[in-house]
Amino acid sequence: MSMSPKHTTPFSVSDILSPLEESYKKVGMEGGGLGAPLAAYRQGQAAPPAAAMQQHAVGHHGAVTAAYHMTAAGVPQLSHSAVGGYCNGNLGNMSELPPYQDTMRNSASGPGWYGANPDPRFPAISRFMGPASGMNMSGMGGLGSLGDVSKNMAPLPSAPRRKRRVLFSQAQVYELERRFKQQKYLSAPEREHLASMIHLTPTQVKIWFQNHRYKMKRQAKDKAAQQQLQQDSGGGGGGGGAGCPQQQQAQQQSPRRVAVPVLVKDGKPCQAGAPAPGAGSLQGHAQQQAQQQAQAAQAAAAAISVGSGGPGLGAHPGHQPGSAGQSPDLAHHAASPAALQGQVSSLSHLNSSGSDYGTMSCSTLLYGRTW
């Protein structure tokens, strides 16, 4: 390690004390008077009071000057007892070390490790904060007695265990339930009397009645909630099934369809006796029946004229083939012209033209008879 001002030593305890230890070793080897302090330092024991007060000046001695130029570097003068106590963990003698700032002030004229001019930004701080920083390690031995104290401490009382649940017999439960049905609340004398009867304590009877009352209330509440739920679900399901009666009632209330005669059609007044537009097919069928009946009436009139005989038989020879080709039904109609006239008149209400045609057939019948 070079001690030139260009290279600086790391600022740590081990880096500062290691060159001091080597320098003191060299001094002890050259000077026989320093054997006792170095032996105390090696063995880790406290130095005697006489050696503790002795100081070795770092002056123009050859061995000390050869060791890192410590005078020029401005390293503080340390006693062997202080260094030995610091390295062995005994901090009681740390107050004997000289202040670091005083040494730096005295050696400000020579070139040192940290420069000639100290930085004015940092305050003047002592090396080890004076004698108040001494630590008394002798009291640490009392920590070993904590184990004995913990052993001597009595264990903490555990929480009281819960009493085991008492199970009632069937006879006791039956008697309690029977009395509960009669009376839900018992007075103190009644409770004591019941407890003596079933061999229980009044407290047990009281607690059983309290629990049973709560149980009954909870069951009643659950039952009411279940019934309400069933009603809600039943009302929702029954709403779809009740649609049929509602539809039937609506149909009953709706007006019936009634056939109304048409008085005006396409801006033209219709006949008073004209049927409704929907009866066109019925009217056509009635007209066909009327035509058939008219033909039958003519044939019947011809048959009557033929059956009556007389001079008309030769005058009308054309009627004989027609009368001979008629069916037996026509002969039946010819035999009973009154029935034929009644049938024709019964269909006269279907159509005015049919009724007029019926009157014409009646006139032809009368005319045929006269003729």
Curated annotation (Swiss-Prot):
DNA-binding region: 161-220
Keywords: Activator, DNA-binding, Homeobox, Nucleus, Phosphoprotein, Transcription, Transcription regulation
PTM comment, free text: Phosphorylated on serine residues.
Localization (cell): Nucleus
Top-level taxon of origin: Eukaryota
InterPro entries: HD, HD_metazoa, Homeobox_CS, Homeobox_NK-like, Homeodomain-like_sf
Expressed in which tissues: Thyroid, lung and CNS.
CDD domains from the UniProt entry: homeodomain
One Gene Ontology term from the biological process aspect of the record: positive regulation of DNA-templated transcription
Biased composition (Gly residues): 233-243
Extent of Low complexity compositional bias: 244-253, 272-294
GO CC annotations on file: nucleoplasm; nucleus
Gene3D superfamilies: Homeodomain-like (1.10.10.60)
One MF term in the entry's GO annotations: RNA polymerase II cis-regulatory region sequence-specific DNA binding
Location of the region described as Disordered in the Swiss-Prot/TrEMBL record: 219-294, 308-342
Principal subcellular localization: nucleus
Pfam families for the chain: Homeodomain
Family statement: Belongs to the NK-2 homeobox family.
Function: Transcription factor that binds and activates the promoter of thyroid specific genes such as thyroglobulin, thyroperoxidase, and thyrotropin receptor. Crucial in the maintenance of the thyroid differentiation phenotype. May play a role in lung development and surfactant homeostasis.
Protein name: Thyroid transcription factor 1
Species of origin: Canis lupus familiaris
